[in-house]
């Protein structure tokens, strides 16, 4: 209670000592805003037919979240699933993981081993280094290519600041330290900017140490669920089941993370620039919390289950011209290389053998774009190329003797390669003489190829040495926007999307759940979506923006994991036990529909109200019998709150809420993780959250906040770990 009063007092004192002038950076209505994600080039938001949510730098700092996954969830922009604390898998319009595209500074993060279940790669994006983020809803394949079925989350990192006219050098920076009580979080961030007239650089480094996550203790809308009553540990050379002295602490969920950004920009003249962009993220081992709670014959199934350090390296060079001949909107070319290292390690309770499976992915990319503008029209065109090289290794170690023995790899042991090359063009135009109407079109076409080789057949006698695919791809979009003088906006958008099978889809061998194993199927083909949006928005005097969007998506040739026969058998011996054979197959048609409503209102110069609501429904279409529920469909969720702000102080309070998900609306044996939910399904939940900040002087600011004010015990749908309980946060920021 003392902590509660202290944090509340800090938040309220910010209001008491604030100055009268208005801080416009924290306004919620931004009428003249431009967005980049929809067409990969800057465009007025009012002219974009596709639904877009923008998270600006001031809002990112105000939310003050621990990871990029938490940023997306706390903002209410998307639903986020978690299997462990070091994770976060965004869901956009009923699509998740490899069906949602992640983009950083215009470069695809998705690679050839992004899986269709749940992912945690988003946490390798340092949210403390972000300038903004844009969430694009609905298929975005025309602009970005494969994987953007449900949409795209586009991150834009901070850019260095140049010296102004008359200055020889401009330097500055900022640093902060944050503490959070629910997981004993300790995060430190430092950022330095040095800029001259022609060269400028920014360096940012973040270190985070997260302890075991404490869940809430108040049951909210349902019975208590998810307590960690027992855990496995090794004592005296033997696996032992121990009683957790505090069952609200989710034992073995903590981890550490390190993030680095270095960006250097050289401007030889006013028309051209060269940018070197280097990003590196790594972590400690990350415990797979949900698997560590799986029951087994001796109490728990696993003694160890963790991801090894998750490493992401990005090195990119970008050349840009403001104008180049006919292309008066400029040209840009980005050459990039990414290296991703992932591993997973598991050992069953009482078994001295631990399995190690390691993956390395190298990704080379080239993106070129050119823009042309006329009086009432604009056009953007470009070329995309990516090449993925996947190497997979595995072994089994006896932790008692140190003996190393062979083990089957997660992906083809002979390596896998995947390429895609495509050209795209987008065009928009305003009707001359009636500029209330804006029309847009887009088209992408190209080819993708994949090859995976199976060398060692010790564990699986595959009837083939390699699997190959070569596929033509295409997508298109068509939009119309009407902006009336009275403040009404009508947007119509039709688009298609695609996702080509990657190495994970085609060549993976692993256990999706105990007692089953997924084997390769070289005959799968791309997934496709066809989408239609209707958006109605009311804008009033730059004080109110109320957006409502209805949408429907037809999902065709969906890749699903289903029963399969391998060498004529429906079961094989895998990891020491007979397992049901499954494989990815194009066996599903589905329909997904829903709506969203977003309200932003600057009620007074210093007071804003906001709210968002998202509803999604998905059904698998059956040729015979009743339709089935589609997995990855979240319950209704949303966010509602207020923000009071001045140049020195701000206070923000909001509710995050999720509806319930009945167990009958889960897809049996799908990706909804019904085994980690109560018997009747996932209960509804709501958390109250409060943030406050006060700037004492130009160089010093204090932020304080309380997440989950009422210490509600809850678990997000499809997740394998409970959400954090009451979390006191305090952050000290220094700028120079």
What are these regions, as identified by a protein language model?
Residues 20-61, 97:
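Short, acidic, small-residue-rich periplasmic hinge/interaction motif at the N-terminus
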Residues 21, 251-257, 267, 271-328, ...:
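Flexible loop and strand-edge segments within Gram-negative outer membrane beta-barrel domains
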Residues 68-71, 88-91, 103, 120-123, ...:
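N-terminal periplasmic accessory domains that precede
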Residues 109-139:
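Short acidic/polar hinge/loop motifs at secondary-structure boundaries
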Residues 183-209, 220-285, 311-313, 430-433, ...:
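Transmembrane beta-barrel wall of Gram-negative outer-membrane proteins
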Residues 267-269, 384, 411-555, 612-617, ...:
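Structural signature of Gram-negative outer-membrane beta-barrels, strongest in the C-terminal barrel
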Residues 359, 363-369, 418-422, 519-525, ...:
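Outer membrane beta-barrel strand-and-loop segments of large Gram-negative receptors
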Residues 433-434, 439, 448, 551-554, ...:
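Gram-negative outer-membrane beta-barrel transporters
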């Amino acid at each position: 209670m003392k902590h509660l009063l202290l944090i509340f007092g800090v938040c309220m004192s910010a209001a008491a000592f604030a100055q009268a002038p208005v801080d416009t950076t924290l306004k919620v209505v931004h009428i003249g805003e431009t967005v980049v994600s929809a067409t990969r080039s800057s465009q007025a938001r009012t002219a974009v037919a596709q639904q877009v949510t923008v998270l600006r730098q001031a809002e990112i700092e105000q939310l003050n979240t621990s990871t990029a996954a938490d940023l997306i969830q706390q903002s209410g922009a998307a639903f986020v699933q978690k299997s462990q604390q070091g994770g976060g898998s965004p869901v956009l319009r009923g699509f998740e993981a490899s069906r949602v595209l992640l983009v950083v500074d215009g470069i695809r993060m998705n690679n050839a081993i992004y899986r269709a279940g749940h992912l945690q790669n988003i946490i390798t994006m340092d949210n403390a280094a972000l300038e903004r983020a844009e969430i694009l809803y609905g298929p975005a394949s025309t602009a970005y290519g494969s994987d953007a079925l449900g949409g795209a989350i586009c991150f834009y990192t901070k850019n260095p600041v140049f010296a102004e006219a008359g200055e020889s050098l401009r330097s500055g920076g900022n640093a902060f330290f944050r503490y959070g009580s629910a997981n004993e979080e300790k995060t430190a961030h430092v950022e330095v900017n040095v800029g001259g007239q022609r060269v400028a650089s920014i360096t940012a480094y973040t270190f985070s140490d997260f302890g075991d996550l404490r869940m809430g203790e108040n049951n909210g809308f349902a019975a208590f669920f998810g307590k960690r009553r027992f855990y496995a540990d090794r004592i005296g050379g033997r696996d032992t089941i121990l009683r957790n002295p505090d069952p609200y602490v989710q034992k073995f969920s903590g981890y550490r993370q390190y993030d680095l950004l270095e960006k250097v920009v050289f401007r030889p003249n006013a028309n051209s620039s060269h940018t070197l962009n280097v990003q590196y993220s790594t972590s400690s081992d990350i415990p797979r919390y949900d698997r560590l709670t799986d029951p087994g014959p001796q109490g728990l199934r696993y003694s160890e289950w963790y991801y090894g350090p998750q490493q992401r390296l990005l090195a990119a060079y970008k050349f840009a011209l403001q104008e180049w001949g006919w292309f008066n909107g400029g040209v840009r070319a980005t050459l990039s290389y990414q290296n991703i290292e992932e591993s997973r390690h598991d050992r069953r309770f009482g078994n001295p053998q631990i399995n190690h499976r390691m993956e390395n992915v190298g990704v080379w990319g080239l993106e070129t774009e050119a823009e042309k503008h006329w009086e009432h029209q604009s056009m953007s065109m470009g070329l995309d190329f990516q090449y993925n090289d996947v190497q997979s290794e595995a072994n089994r170690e006896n932790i008692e003797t140190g003996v190393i023995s062979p083990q089957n790899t997660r992906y083809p042991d002979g390596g896998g390669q995947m390429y895609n090359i495509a050209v795209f063009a987008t065009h928009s135009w305003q009707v001359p003489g009636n500029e209330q109407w804006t029309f847009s079109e887009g088209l992408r076409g190209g080819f993708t190829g994949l090859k995976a080789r199976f060398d060692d057949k010790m564990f699986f006698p595959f009837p083939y040495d390699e699997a190959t695919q070569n596929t033509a791809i295409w997508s298109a979009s068509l939009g119309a926007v009407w902006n009336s003088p009275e403040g009404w906006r009508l947007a119509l958008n039709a688009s298609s999307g695609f996702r080509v099978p990657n190495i994970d889809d085609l060549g993976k061998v692993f256990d999706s759940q105990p007692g089953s194993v997924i084997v390769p199927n070289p005959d799968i083909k791309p997934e496709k979506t066809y989408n239609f949006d209707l958006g109605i928005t009311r804008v009033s005097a730059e004080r109110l923006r109320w957006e409502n969007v209805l949408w429907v998506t037809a999902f065709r040739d969906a890749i699903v994991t289903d029963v399969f026969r391998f060498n004529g058998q429906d079961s094989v011996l895998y990891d020491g036990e007979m397992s049901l054979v499954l494989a990815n197959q194009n066996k599903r048609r589905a329909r997904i529909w829903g709506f969203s409503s977003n309200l932003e209102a600057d009620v007074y110069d210093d007071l804003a109200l906001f709210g968002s609501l998202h509803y999604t429904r998905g059904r698998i279409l059956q040729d015979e019998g009743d339709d089935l529920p589609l997995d990855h469909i979240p319950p209704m969720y949303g966010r509602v709150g207020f923000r009071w702000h001045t140049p020195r102080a701000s206070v923000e309070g909001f509710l995050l809420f999720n509806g319930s998900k009945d167990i009958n609306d889960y897809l049996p044996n799908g990706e909804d993780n019904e085994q980690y939910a109560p018997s009747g399904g996932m209960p509804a939940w709501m958390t109250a959250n409060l943030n406050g900040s006060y700037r004492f002087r130009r160089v010093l600011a204090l932020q304080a906040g309380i997440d989950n004010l009422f210490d509600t015990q809850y678990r997000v749908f499809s997740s394998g770990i409970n959400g954090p309980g009451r979390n006191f946060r305090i952050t000290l920021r220094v700028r120079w």
